[in-house]
Amino acid sequence: MEQTTLLRLAGAGLTALAGALALGPVVIPLMRRLRAGQTIRAEMSARHQAKAGTPTMGGVIFIIPAILATLIFAPRSGDALPRLIIALVLTVGHGLVGFADDYIKVVLKRSLGLRARDKLLAQVGLAAVLGYGAVEVLGLGTAVTLPVLNLTLELGRPLYYLLVLIMVWGTASAVNFADGLDGLLGGLSVITFSFYGLVVALALGQTDMAVLGTALVGGVLGFLHYNRHPARIFMGDVGSFALGGALAALAVLTKTEFLLVIVGAVYVIEVISVILQVLSFRLTGRRIFKMAPLHHHFELLGWSEGQVLRLFWGAGLLFTLLGWLVLPGMLAGR
């Protein structure tokens, strides 16, 4: 790794970390004054009921420093500038969608939040930016590589744009479902973005994407200081949606679309548990899990939050290591 690249990554990570640590004491009292407290579902465990009223919308604590750090330290020459713009549009755009959803729910006290139709329309627009930018602006093409098999498939524009839409919507939803315990999504995000920033992006020579990934890692680490158990603030949809948008952008812009299924397998499992729970109840009247997403099932089995965190973080690390093992084969096939 070149010294300049190392300095960029260190600068971005440390700047975002310091910024998040500095913003916490400002944002937490502000959210309390706005009465932006989290509501807790009635079927949750007694431990969760005690968290009712904890400030939410804390994602701004890491999003703002991470974006600023990226703008300061990311290179802008060649394809880096349009690639960076696309990734930041996906990150900030999803953050704004999540912010609107949070604001309507917790500040305006309208429990349904942003209408599903409006949320989907916004994500369709963001997916269009990502798909068009990747194919037409950056010329990345419409072929995808299947990990493990290392097969390259040419999808063509219509199918590829559909894939990007599914990735954007699915990744944001799956990451959002994983945000249910103190520190859970934060820890998983540190693992995932470390891999995409320090392994995938650097392997492809995309220093700009590496800076974005590292800045998000630094920002989330700073946020975890306030989100660790017992959490003083939750990231809310503003945080989880921004992370989901950034993750989808990194996967598409590095042309590792299907590798995300492996590296982000914990997110996939979480959303599948919700789908299975809903289908089972509608078709049979019975629930497969005590509660979905899956992390709540373990809680209701009597596991402590620490035990659930260790299981999910450990699984996230193992799936990321698996992704690391199959990455060279994918890159060799290009």
UniProtKB/Swiss-Prot annotation:
Domain of life the protein comes from: Bacteria
Cellular component per GO, a single term: plasma membrane
Bilayer-spanning residue ranges: 11-31, 55-75, 84-104, 124-144, 158-178, 184-204, 205-225, 233-253, 258-278, 311-331
Biological process (GO), any one: peptidoglycan biosynthetic process
Membrane topology classification: Multi-pass membrane protein
Coiled-coil segments: none
An annotated Gene Ontology molecular function: phospho-N-acetylmuramoyl-pentapeptide-transferase activity
Full protein name: Phospho-N-acetylmuramoyl-pentapeptide-transferase
Native source species: Symbiobacterium thermophilum (strain DSM 24528 / JCM 14929 / IAM 14863 / T)
